[in-house]
């Protein structure tokens, strides 16, 4: 009986073609098998056109030997660099830990190294030595003992007692709570005797100065009153002050007014200093750090103050020298064009300037003071209406006896600083700032007294600065008396408007 099912006949060469493309796919391992099979058969058709006489089996065999082997070599060369890169990446990643045990996995381990630092930093005190040697600075910065970056105990380290810390260093704990407690009063006051310390946060390593030192700069912008006792004819002022420069470390004043200075004819060595809590310990300055300033005073005619010059602060060990530089001093007065009388002014500047007045030119030796100023002024007063009136002097309590008349005038001073080491060489400041002063003139018989005050006096008719005990009136020299007799004074009917 004949079967009705059709028989499938496999064409010749189909098995050979399928085996060839399968071997090529297994050998090359392409990413896209369909596209690779299409390229395979296209290349096989092109290869057959050049070899038409070959059988299908021989054709596939030669095609594999020529074409497929080249394809496999090319893919192998391309895969080799990729494998090398994968191996390198794998080796780099393998160096980092991929697992962490829960017993050692704490919050401190998850913090990066640069972001976490538990070290104690100590900084030297600014008041101990302002100028440090370059070799000592790294040693002072590294004075704190380092601690491990990841301590086993979670509790912060206890801060040492303030007594165990040196006077030149301030302990700054890394823990915010301990730092706040230490700043609130666990350490000694910075105003105590010889225990001045400067608290600097770990995050801010910039050296800073205390507010007491910076408060002295605020007084420079204020007006300064200079009470002066002068004769009715001609006034020639000469101020001499010898003192060592020091800066008070007391509390900052609430207002802009500073403590007024006093005048005395005796040197500063004979006077007693304020209490120790109000100022830093005084140490005499050496001769190599003296600063000499020259002042030239001249009269002007307009009522507008010419303000120029600048003040600078020179820091030296345990002292801060605040000399005035580049100021123009002049008397606001309608001055007649008469021959001026030169007046030499040697003044030592300090936080509390003590000056004695003389009408003669005086020479000051350099060893008396660390800062000197020399000035020349041309001052002419012709007000005979005040002649014959007694002088006015304030008593010890601050009240004044109104005996003479007072006239305010504005004074502007110009300073040029000279260092004694450089003879004849001026160190002039490029910029200039202004300092306006008010002068009150009080009639006196035959003497003139000028008191430089650091207080801010805004009213010309205010109470004058008290004159301390021991204020003497110097006598006129013969040269000055001769100059007065040559007619430098106007007639009695003419008055000078100040």
From Swiss-Prot:
Keyword DNA damage listed: no
SUPFAM superfamilies named among the record's database cross-references: Dimerization-anchoring domain of cAMP-dependent PK regulatory subunit
Further information: On the 2D-gel the determined pI of this protein is: 4.3 to 4.6, its MW is: 97 kDa.
Role summary: May function as a regulator of both motility- and head-associated functions such as capacitation and the acrosome reaction. Binds calcium in vitro.
Gene: CABYR
Protein name: Calcium-binding tyrosine phosphorylation-regulated protein
Modification after translation, per record: Phosphorylated on tyrosine residues during in vitro capacitation. Dephosphorylation affects its ability to bind calcium.
GO terms under biological process: sperm capacitation
Keywords: Calcium, Cell projection, Cilium, Cytoplasm, Cytoskeleton, Flagellum, Metal-binding, Phosphoprotein
Record GO terms (molecular function): calcium ion binding
Pfam hit, one: RIIa
């Amino acid at each position: 009986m004949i079967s009705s099912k059709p028989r499938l006949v496999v064409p010749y060469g189909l098995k050979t073609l399928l085996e060839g493309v399968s071997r090529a796919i297994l050998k090359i391992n392409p990413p896209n098998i369909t596209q690779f099979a299409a390229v395979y058969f296209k290349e096989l058709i092109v290869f057959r056109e050049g070899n038409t006489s070959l059988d299908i089996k021989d054709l596939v065999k030669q095609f594999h030997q020529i074409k497929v082997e080249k394809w496999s070599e090319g893919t192998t060369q391309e895969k080799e660099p990729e494998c090398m890169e994968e191996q390198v990446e794998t080796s780099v990643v393998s160096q980092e830990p991929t697992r962490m045990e829960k017993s050692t996995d704490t919050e401190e381990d998850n913090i990066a190294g640069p972001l976490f630092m538990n070290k104690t930093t100590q900084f030297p005190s600014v008041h101990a030595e302002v100028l440090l040697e370059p070799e000592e600075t790294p040693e002072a910065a590294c004075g704190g003992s380092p601690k491990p970056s990841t301590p086993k105990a979670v509790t912060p380290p206890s801060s040492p007692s303030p007594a165990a810390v040196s006077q030149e260093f301030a302990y700054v704990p890394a823990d915010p709570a301990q730092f706040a407690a230490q700043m609130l009063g666990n350490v000694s006051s910075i105003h105590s005797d010889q225990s001045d310390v400067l608290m600097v946060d770990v995050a801010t390593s910039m050296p800073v100065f205390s507010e007491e030192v910076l408060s002295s700069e605020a007084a420079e912008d204020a007006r300064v009153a200079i009470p002066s006792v002068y004769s009715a004819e001609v006034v020639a002022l000469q101020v001499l002050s010898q003192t060592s420069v020091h800066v008070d470390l007391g509390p900052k004043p609430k207002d802009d007014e500073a403590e007024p200075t006093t005048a005395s004819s005796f040197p500063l060595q004979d006077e007693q200093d304020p209490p120790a809590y109000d100022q830093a310990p005084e140490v005499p300055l050496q001769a190599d750090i003296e600063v000499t300033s020259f002042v030239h005073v001249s009269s002007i005619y307009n009522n507008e103050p010419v303000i120029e010059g600048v003040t600078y602060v020179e820091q030296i060990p345990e002292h801060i020298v605040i000399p005035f530089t580049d100021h123009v001093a002049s008397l606001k007065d309608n001055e007649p064009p008469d021959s001026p009388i030169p007046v030499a002014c040697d003044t030592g500047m300090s936080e509390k300037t003590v000056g004695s007045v003389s009408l003669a030119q005086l020479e000051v030796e350099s060893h008396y003071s660390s800062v000197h100023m020399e000035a020349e002024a041309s001052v002419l007063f012709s007000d005979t209406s005040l002649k014959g009136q007694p002088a006015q002097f304030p008593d010890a309590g601050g009240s004044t006896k109104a005996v003479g008349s007072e006239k305010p005038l504005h004074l502007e001073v110009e300073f040029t600083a000279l260092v004694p080491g450089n003879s004849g060489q001026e160190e002039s400041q490029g910029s200039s700032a202004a300092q306006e002063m008010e002068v009150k003139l009080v009639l006196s018989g035959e003497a003139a007294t000028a008191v430089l005050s650091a207080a801010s006096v805004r009213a010309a008719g205010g109470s004058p600065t008290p004159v301390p005990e021991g204020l003497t009136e110097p006598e006129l020299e013969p040269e000055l008396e001769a100059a007065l007799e040559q007619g430098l004074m106007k007639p009695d009917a003419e008055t000078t408007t100040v």
